[in-house]
Regions:
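ATP-dependent carboxylate/acyl-activation modules
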Residues: 1-216
């Protein structure tokens, strides 16, 4: 994904430092609940930049839409909006290798992003930065391999987030070749034991969430 000509949305007030970073790349718009005066001064130097302040509270926006409607040549699909939140108290560390606090934060960060990517979705992240985002693949292994290829050398000790379960060990083997440190996925298939055993073999930390996103 490219930031060139993109729109950046923030869930918190944009301060001076954030504005400096945002103004260093070409953007079409910046959206946030509020802007510090210094931040506004910096952003307004770009006359072509659209600066949008949210009036409706962010939490309200997140819960406003209860259903999604998709119209196809074969009919209309109506489904509940995916408003599921990941609870750190309910996910399970299923591997022998345990993720440290920083890795868990990266896993949760990547998982939140994968939620909004078209399935099959895979996100590779490290240090609160996305290294690659891949979506719309027809198989999990294709999504994993493409994401790892885009992440390149940065994948070492990074984490992978999948929007659904990992159905086979081939994804674990691909992750091991790139020295991935941790994987967060839904879990819950009849091959879970094989997948966890493979993670243990390659000393990869694994978390299962019990939540499947599968954005269509």
């Amino acid at each position: 994904m490219s930031t060139f000509g993109a729109t950046i949305a923030f869930s918190k007030t944009v301060d001076k430092e954030i504005a400096k970073h945002a103004s260093s790349v070409f953007l079409d718009a910046v959206i946030a609940p509020d802007f510090d005066p210094d931040a506004l001064e910096i952003l307004k130097k770009n006359e072509a930049l659209r600066i949008i302040k949210l009036i409706t509270p962010y939490k309200t926006i997140r819960t406003m839409q209860e259903q999604e409607v998709h119209i196809t040549p074969f009919g209309t699909l109506v489904q509940e909006t995916d408003n599921k939140e990941l609870d750190k108290d309910t996910f399970k560390v299923v591997s022998k290798t345990k993720p440290d606090a920083e890795m868990i934060e990266d896993m949760v960060f990547a998982w939140k992003i994968a939620k909004h990517v078209k399935t099959n979705a895979v996100v590779v992240a490290k240090d609160f930065k996305t290294l690659s985002i891949v979506g719309g693949q027809t198989s999990r292994i294709d999504a994993v391999e493409t994401a790892l290829d885009r992440a390149c050398d940065g994948a070492k000790k990074a984490v992978i987030a999948c929007d659904g379960f990992i159905p086979a060990i081939d994804s674990i083997q691909a992750a091991a070749q790139c020295r991935i440190g941790g994987i967060i996925q839904t879990g819950g298939t009849h091959k879970d034991k094989d997948v966890v055993d493979a993670a243990n073999k390659y000393e990869i930390a694994m978390i299962t969430t019990g939540i499947r996103h599968f954005k269509h």
